[in-house]
């Protein structure tokens, strides 16, 4: 079994590890131009961004070929997912690949412009994350065939947001998310921000006003990994609702670097 995943702060890597099999990071696969995926079972585990899939996931899926007897998709989300799984199924269907099983997992949301991390962390117990994962793992082990039903409102929300996000102006706006980042004097130049970026959008070799500090480009994926994983909490977003940071406790920063580094 092969799992194609995308992670920013560890949630989707953790879910992928719990499912098991050979874990393949989408940013690494994209960088290495590995588009032929073959296996008895192939799974796609990704987060929900703006009621749809992250652009990096869409970009990769549109280039792949999949040969498998069993295909499943899992999407993690914080509050609302809309019809986020639908774009994946549509892309794969155009390639002649039918999804056998799809499901969702509600987890901690790390999107700082919308959520106070203090409040998000308090919801962890109520979300029964481990129970959700256990159910999905069992379903996959049993090769269950069932797709998550998506209502009309959910489909509509995903369609509308998808058109905005994936349009040329929408894409450009997302890529410029890092224009709203700023770095404090707490920065030590450790380069973790550079290594966890799935787009190679951070250059720690540059200096800002003669001080160590990352230089952000215009290829941001809006995953906020660089902000959340900074060990000194030195990177901030002007529109953030919280200075508290999040990383899935079951995943190490080193694992996220291995998954995302473009260096």
Model-derived features: where do they sit?
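A mid-sequence, solvent-exposed acidic-amphipathic segment
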Residues: 156-195
């Amino acid at each position: 079994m092969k799992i194609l995943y995308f992670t920013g702060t560890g949630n989707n890597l953790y879910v992928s590890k719990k499912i098991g099999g050979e874990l393949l990071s989408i940013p690494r696969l994209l960088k290495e131009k590995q588009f032929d995926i073959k296996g008895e079972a192939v799974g796609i585990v990704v987060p929900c961004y703006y009621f749809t899939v992250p652009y990096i996931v869409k970009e990769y899926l549109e280039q792949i070929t999949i040969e498998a007897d069993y295909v499943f998709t899992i999407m993690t989300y914080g509050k609302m997912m809309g019809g986020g799984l639908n774009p994946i199924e549509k892309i794969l269907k155009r390639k002649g690949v039918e999804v056998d099983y799809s499901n969702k997992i509600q987890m901690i949301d790390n999107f700082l412009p919308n959520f106070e991390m203090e409040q998000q962390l308090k919801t962890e117990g109520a979300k029964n994350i481990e129970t959700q994962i256990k159910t999905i793992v069992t379903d996959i082990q049993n090769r269950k065939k069932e797709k998550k039903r998506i209502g009309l409102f959910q489909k509509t929300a995903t369609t509308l947001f998808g058109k905005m996000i994936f349009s040329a102006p929408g894409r450009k706006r997302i890529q410029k998310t890092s224009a709203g980042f700023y770095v404090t004097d707490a920065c030590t130049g450790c380069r973790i921000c550079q290594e966890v970026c799935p787009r190679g959008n951070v250059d720690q070799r540059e200096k800002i006003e003669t001080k160590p500090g990352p230089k952000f480009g215009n290829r941001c994926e809006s995953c906020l990994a660089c902000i959340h994983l900074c060990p000194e909490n030195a990177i901030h977003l002007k529109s953030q609702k919280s200075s508290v940071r999040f990383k899935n406790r079951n995943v190490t920063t080193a694992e996220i670097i291995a998954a995302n580094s473009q260096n």
